[in-house]
Structure formats: structure tokens, C-alpha cells
Amino acid sequence: MDILINEYYNLEQTLELEQSIISKKQSHNGYSVEREYINSKEYHDKFEKLAVNKDVQQSIYIQTGRLLEHVDGHGEEKMVAIDARTGKFIVDNFAREGRIESTSFTNDEYLLIQKSKNSVVLIHNHSENGRPSAQDLLTYLNDLHIRLSIVACHDGTLYE
């Protein structure tokens, strides 16, 4: 029985890796996501090195793909929060207008994060592929509810 479960798990993992995390688009500009790399096994494997459990690693990977799909071709930054223990989606700020070089949650969105029993993982993008800003670092250091903060760049670079 254990062999069947392991085979099923391996098949499931293989199928997940074969599916594109971000779709192809016809137009490209300076803010376009590097689709080929983002859809690669090498990119997926970066998430397996994160210091969280496998379910959370996979959730971070999926939410990062969803984030990059949303901002592909745009200079604005957006953000997603997930539960750091379960990987469950908490909130994102995709529904409103974004800003270039900064992002934040509204008070109502942040309240959803504060209501979480567990710590959270924040994921946001840097469309110009830059390192985490001073504000990114301060937010992470000053909010004890944040377990992990990830910056996903459009070129496939990840900062944690």
C-alpha cells in the first residue's frame, strides 16, 4: 500500500511540474515575466528550499505563479498573504489599482492577516527585478506575525 501511495504522490508531483504556472502572451515589454524560466523545473525547485513544510512550499509556488500571471507586463507591485503553517490563501490586493515600486494591504485586508491564528507568508513582486527595499525589510522585521517574506522578480529571481 505504501508503494502505491508513493507512486501516486510521485505521479502527482510530475504532473504539477509539467503544467505551466504562467500562460503565454503575445505581447512583451520591459515588465514582462520570463515565462520560460518561471515555468521551468529549476524555478519550481527554488521553492523546495524554503524553510517551511512541503504543502506551504507548494502553496507559495502556486500563489507566486498567480501573482506573476496577474502583474505580467505591468510595472505595479501586488501582494499575497498565505498561512505559514497550512499554506491556505488569506488575502491579496489584486482587485485594486497598484503602484510602481511599492505595495501594501488596506486596513481591511490587513485585518484578515491579523485574524490568522498562525504566522503568515507574504509574497510580492518587483517588476524591475530589484532586491528587497528598506521598507520590505522593515515590514518583515517589525511585524512578528510574518514568518517569511518573499520578493518574486519578473526575471525569476526570488528573495526571501
Named regions from a protein language model:
Residues 55-69:
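Short, basic/aromatic recognition patches
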Residues 71-77:
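Short, flexible loop/turn motifs enriched in small residues
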Residues 85, 94-96, 124-126:
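Short glycine-rich, polar/acidic loop-and-turn segments at beta strand-coil junctions
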Residues 90, 95-112:
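Active-site-proximal segments of catalytic enzyme domains
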